[in-house]
Amino acid sequence: MQIHTTIQSLRAARAAVSGKVALVPTMGNLHDGHIALMRQATGHADSIVASIFVNRLQFGPRDDFDRYPRTFKADCERLEAAGVAHVFAPDEGEMYPQPQQYHVDPAPAHVTILEGEFRPDHFRGVATVVLKLLNIVRPDVALFGKKDYQQLMVLTNMVRELAVAVEVVPGETIRATDGLALSSRNGYLSAEERVEAPRLYRELARVRDAVRDGDRDFLKLETEAVAGLAAHGWHPDYIAVRRRADLQPPGDANDPLVVLAAAKLGHTRLIDNLEI
């Protein structure tokens, strides 16, 4: 496995690769969900590139940029074991040698709702760095996890509307045996909070099952789920049933749906979703 810290080095290595290339962007602090994406990528390409870059642009003033764990050595060991051929790990000066003046501004309808309401400019930062990574690596395939469902929707639309020559492949959410979605932020939970954390999944599953059984009173289901979390010390930001395609409120009864949630448990904000 080769580790590249400069754009020039990565591009030279990319030029020497024959066959299909897959990119899996990460911010490091890898868990089994990331590794599942790497293994999934092997089914779509001959060579896998994983990026490790903690992107300041997608962190808000109250987010945890400085607190985000950096575990580079352990990450590289896991990536090599998963069959990754190249790691692109630039520092901030390499990715942003001067303050970034050009950005990708996603459609307001996609980024002022749900996560966008609570994290202004987050998706602007995500879309900007991902487009930059796609331009650097020039992969045939890029993989993103469904756990960040709104991010996946934004990036899929960005790639389509900007005619980027890459196939976006979604990866299923990987969960602990108790249902908690794997996330780098789970490490912030105390022992007691970790026991409580799967309740977020259970509330989502309850909404999903009710809708599958024919309940179309989405507001009632959302309100009950919020109350169920709040009764156990959570501080929910939202639980919402939305259309998968654009995360707008459901319309036609045949629209494929997803239920999404974000809530704070102690000092840790968790997000999750389930397709219906």
Curated annotation (Swiss-Prot):
<keyword id="KW-0067">ATP-binding</keyword>
<protein>
    <recommendedName>
        <fullName>Pantothenate synthetase</fullName>
        <ecNumber>6.3.2.1</ecNumber>
    </recommendedName>
</protein>
<comment type="subunit">
    <text>Homodimer.</text>
</comment>
<dbReference type="GO" id="GO:0005829">
    <property type="term" value="C:cytosol"/>
</dbReference>
<feature type="binding site">
    <location>
        <begin position="27"/>
        <end position="34"/>
    </location>
    <ligand>
        <name>ATP</name>
    </ligand>
</feature>
<feature type="binding site">
    <location>
        <position position="58"/>
    </location>
    <ligand>
        <name>beta-alanine</name>
    </ligand>
</feature>
<keyword id="KW-0547">Nucleotide-binding</keyword>
<feature type="binding site">
    <location>
        <position position="58"/>
    </location>
    <ligand>
        <name>(R)-pantoate</name>
    </ligand>
</feature>
<keyword id="KW-0436">Ligase</keyword>
<dbReference type="InterPro" id="IPR042176">
    <property type="entry name" value="Pantoate_ligase_C"/>
</dbReference>
<keyword id="KW-0566">Pantothenate biosynthesis</keyword>
<dbReference type="InterPro" id="IPR014729">
    <property type="entry name" value="Rossmann-like_a/b/a_fold"/>
</dbReference>
<dbReference type="InterPro" id="IPR003721">
    <property type="entry name" value="Pantoate_ligase"/>
</dbReference>
<feature type="binding site">
    <location>
        <begin position="145"/>
        <end position="148"/>
    </location>
    <ligand>
        <name>ATP</name>
    </ligand>
</feature>
<feature type="binding site">
    <location>
        <position position="151"/>
    </location>
    <ligand>
        <name>(R)-pantoate</name>
    </ligand>
</feature>
<comment type="similarity">
    <text>Belongs to the pantothenate synthetase family.</text>
</comment>
<feature type="active site" description="Proton donor">
    <location>
        <position position="34"/>
    </location>
</feature>
<comment type="function">
    <text>Catalyzes the condensation of pantoate with beta-alanine in an ATP-dependent reaction via a pantoyl-adenylate intermediate.</text>
</comment>
<dbReference type="Pfam" id="PF02569">
    <property type="entry name" value="Pantoate_ligase"/>
</dbReference>
<dbReference type="GO" id="GO:0005524">
    <property type="term" value="F:ATP binding"/>
</dbReference>
<comment type="pathway">
    <text>Cofactor biosynthesis; (R)-pantothenate biosynthesis; (R)-pantothenate from (R)-pantoate and beta-alanine: step 1/1.</text>
</comment>
<keyword id="KW-0963">Cytoplasm</keyword>
<dbReference type="GO" id="GO:0015940">
    <property type="term" value="P:pantothenate biosynthetic process"/>
</dbReference>
<dbReference type="GO" id="GO:0004592">
    <property type="term" value="F:pantoate-beta-alanine ligase activity"/>
</dbReference>
<feature type="binding site">
    <location>
        <begin position="182"/>
        <end position="185"/>
    </location>
    <ligand>
        <name>ATP</name>
    </ligand>
</feature>
<feature type="binding site">
    <location>
        <position position="174"/>
    </location>
    <ligand>
        <name>ATP</name>
    </ligand>
</feature>
